[in-house]
Every structure is written in C-alpha cells, then in structure tokens.
Amino acid sequence: MSLILKLLKIINYIIHFRKNLMKKIIAAAFISIALISCKKETQTVTKIDPKTGKTVTVEVPINDSLKTGTASEKLAIIDSLGVFKQSFKLVKGDTYPLTTFQKDVQTMTAPDGKTQSGSSESTDQMTFTVNNFDKGIYDITINLLGKRSSQAANGKSVVIDTKTAEPKEEQLKMMWKVNKALVGNTLNLKMDESGKVISITGFDPIYTKVTASVGTLIKEAAQKTAFAKSFKESFNEKILKEQFTKNLVLIPSKGAKIGDKWTETENATPDGKIKLSTTYSLKSVENGIATITVSGGIPAKSDQKTQDGITRSMTSELSQNGTITLDQKTGWIKNQNIAVKTSQSETLSDGKQKQTMKSVSNSTVVVNPVK
C-alpha cells in the first residue's frame, strides 16, 4: 500500500473518531442538561413545623424554595433551626396602630352580704408613622390621636371623650381639658431594628400646652407647679419607653422555640414587696402570625396587723391569662387580649365579732382591638 493511501486511511479514521467523539460529547451534554433540569424541578429542604417546632424534611420546587428564602429574608420574625427571633421590618411612609383599651368591672360585697358593682373603660389611640430608616435606625412620628374614659355605677354613667364636646360637670372638665390638650400632638421616636427605643423627644411643647389648658381651673401658682410636676412624672420618656418595650418587644432577644416559656417580673407595689410575674409562651408561628400565650399573676398574699385591739386581716390575689399575636412580616403587634382577675378580702375583728368585706375585679386589657 502506498504511503498516500495509508495517510488517507489514517485521516478517515481520525475524522470518524472525532465524529463519534462529538456525538458522545453532545449526548453527554444533553444528559447533563436533562439532569440539571430535573434537579431544578425539586429540591430537598429542611423546615420547621410551625405547630410542633420539630424539624422536617420535604421536597419542594426549587423556585418555591428560592421564593421562600427571599421571603424569609424580609420577615421580621424568622427562625433558625427552630429558634424564632423578633425584629422590626417597617416600611417607610407606612403607619402602624397602637390602640389600648381597658375595661374593669368591680363587685364589692359588704359585711351584710349586699353587693354593689361598677365599671370603667378607657381607650388611648395612637399611631406610629415611619419617616425614615437609616443605618439601622427608624425615625418615627408618634401621633397622639384620642383618649376616652367612662365610668358607670348605680345606673349612672359619665363619659370623657376628646372627640366630643367639653362636659358640663365641673368635676369632669379638668380631665377633659388635659386630655384634649394632650391629643393632636406628636412625639419623635428613634428605634433600632431589634425594637430597642433609643430616644423619645418632643415632650416640652406638650407640657406647656397641657399646663396652659388648666389655667382657668387652677389659679394658684403653687397648685399649677404641683400639677405640672405630677403630669411630667406620669408622661415622660422613661414611662413611654417602658410602655412601648412591653407592648412591642415580646420575644426574648435570644429567641424562643415553639412551646418555650419565659417569665418577666415587675413591682406591683412601690416598695417592691409584691411582685407581678408574667409568663409568656410561644404557641405557634404560622400563616404570617406569631401567637404568644400569657399567664401568671400575683400569688395569694396575706397580711395581718393589730392596733387598738382591732385586728385587720387582708388577703389578695391576681391572675391573668390571654393571647398576643404579632405580624410575622413587620414584627408589629396585631392584637392583645388579656383577662385579669383581682380578688381581695378584708376582715376587721375585735376578738368577739368580725366583719368581712370582699372585692372582685375583672379586667380586660386589649391592644389594637379587632373591629
């Protein structure tokens, strides 16, 4: 065989080999693409069951898992291996409500067994408008919108409402004037994403306005000074910081698992001898809502003193239970509904006879009442 023929055969062999190799490469590429496509259809992910808090493994479309991941990054209440943490993801320009409502029904039983009942209600309306969010700090305007209170007993009732005209009764005018001067004002709140209140400012103009509002009712300088001092002690940055922290930041900074409980204790009396304990438990995080249950109170306390031959014995007890719900997307409180029952009994005795008076108060404390 001539050299030329041998070269032609070798060239044909190389061409044939290359064609087969390209076919295999193309086939392999199609198989690879098919496999990648299959992998993109589903993906195994680990999730936390919101009801039980247990870790479960499920197959989900990869698009859905990606969407889930993106949504989780935007949520204010997120979980990491079953531990839920609360933050705030508020939107610039949006306004968030914080309306508090409390109703008390008290029944007193006299020593002769006769009973007398009375009730009272109070509503405070305010909203929070987000002005800006910069370097992890929210700039928020607190809008003081309205205050209403009412009392009813023995078939009679009185109402003080900033959205209605000034009451005619002299004893009610002062409270109405103070409340009327208070609403319509704004405060400025600086808060970080964790809910830590950095500052609340804007009190001085409100102090001036409220003090001036009672000028026609309080004429003596000493009384005006005493009133201004008392008002400042009940309405200031420290008081509002405590109120907002208590109402807005519910989940501990370390986080909580489904079923976890944590307890907070505060003084129920100025001397701190009686403590109020509140136990919270993370019940569930599902459908965009975190649900927290509330229980606790003040255990039964007894006190006895004798003076001038008269022994005075007193027992008291407080219990509370209810539910708080938070919006998972923003971290803001959606609703709170807590029932509080206070029982008190007082007995006077001279050793020969005794008289006992009992009092039972049932209260409902609601934040952002459901309309």
State what each model feature region is.
Residues 35-37:
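C-terminal motif of bacterial Sec signal peptides marking the signal peptidase cleavage site
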Residues 2, 18-25, 39-40:
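Positively charged n-region of N-terminal signal peptides that target proteins for export
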Residues 7:
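Cationic, low-complexity basic patches in intrinsically disordered or flexible, solvent-exposed regions
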Residues 41-371:
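Signature of exported/secreted
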